[in-house]
Amino acid sequence: MQYRTLGHTGLLVSRLCLGTMTFSNGEGVYQHIGNVGQKEADELVRTAFEAGVNFFDTADVYSAGASEATLGQSFRNLGLARSDVVLATKVYSRMGPGRNDVGASRGHIMDAVDASLRRLQTDHIDLYQVHANDTITPIDETLRALDDLVTQGKVRYVGVSNWQAWKIARAIGVSAEKGLARFETVQAYYSLAGRDLEREIAPLLEAEKMGLMVWSPLAGGLLSGKFSRDNQKPADSRRSGFDFPIVDKERAWNIIDVLAPIARRHQVSPARVALAWLLSREVVTSVIMGARRIDQLQDNLGAIDLQLDQEELQALDEVSVLPPEYPGWMLATQSADRLGPVDLWGEALHS
C-alpha cells in the first residue's frame, strides 16, 4: 500500500480508501446502493485493512445511520486499534423530519456529530466533512462550529464535499483571517468519464495544498468492465437502474474503447486500469473504493500495484480530455508565448 499526507497535515492515509455506502440495513435514500450486512462488512473491512488500507469513509446519511453503525461495529468485532484507522464521516444531509434536521448550521452540526460518535462507537472523528453546499447558512457559522469541534477534541480535521471552487477558496480565506480550522480536504467526483474538477477545483487544491478524496472513481460502475457500446444496460449493474453520476455517454463509450484493450494487455479488469489512472494523478490523495463483495474489493486493491506506461496514460488522457471551455481556452491562448520564471532566469544566466 502507498500512503500520502492528508492535505497540509502530518496525518498519513492510504491511497485507497474503503467507502461504506454499501453498508446498509435496507433503509434510507442510499438503500439501493448495496445491502451489505454486518458479517459481510466485517470481511470487507478485514480484507481492506490487511491489504494496508487505514482510511475508511462513511456518512451519517448512508442508510439512515446504519453505515456508520456497521462500520463502528466492524472495528469492534475485528479488534482494530482506534489509532490504526483513520475514520472519515460527513454531516449535512437530512437525518430527521424537522426543519433544522439538515444543513451546515451550528445547531445541526453539533447534534449530528454527537449522533455520529455514538453510532461509530468512538470518542473522535479523524476527518469530519461537510457533505454538501448549504445555500442558507453563512460560511462563518459553519467554520466556527467545526473549529469548536476540533477544539473540543471530537474532530481532528475538517473537510468539504461537492462545493464550488470559489466557495472553497472563500472558506479557506475566512479560516485564515479568523484563525479557524480550515478545510484540509475536498471529496469530489473524479473519473476518466468525469474530469470536470480539473477546470477549477484541481488548481485550487494544488495552490492551497489541500487533499483530494475521489468518490465514484468508476463513474457509478460505468468503467467497471460490465458496460460497453454494445452492452449499455447490463442486468447485473446498479447503474442500469440508477443512472448516476451524470456522464456524456458517447464520450464514455469512446473511453471504454481505449480502456478495455489496455486492461486486456495487462490481464486485469478495466476497473483496475481506471483506478490506476486516477492514482497516477498528482492531485489525488486517496481513491474511495465501494464494494459489495470481496472479489470486487480485491480487484480494486490490485490497482495500487498496476503501473501504466506513458503511452497508455497518454492514450487515456487524450480520449478523456475535457472539451474546451471558457475561460480555459482563452487563458491558454493568451499565455502561449509567456515565459515562466525558470525560463527567464535560465536566459539571464546564459546572456
Regions found by a protein language model. Name each.
Residues 1, 42, 231-265, 283-284, ...:
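Terminal-tail/helix-coil boundary detector
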Residues 1-85:
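N-terminal binding-site loop/beta-alpha segment at the start of enzyme catalytic domains
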Residues 6, 18, 41, 56, ...:
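Conserved, mostly hydrophobic/aromatic
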Residues 11-16, 52-54, 81-85, 122-126, ...:
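Short, well-ordered coil/turn segments that N-cap beta-strands
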Residues 27-28, 33, 94-196, 200:
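Glycine/proline-rich, positively charged
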Residues 45, 68, 72, 113-117, ...:
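Generic structural signal for well-ordered alpha-helices
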Residues 91-93, 164, 190-194, 216-223, ...:
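Glycine-rich beta-alpha junction loops
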Residues 197-236, 269:
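Aromatic-lined glycan-binding groove of carbohydrate-active enzymes
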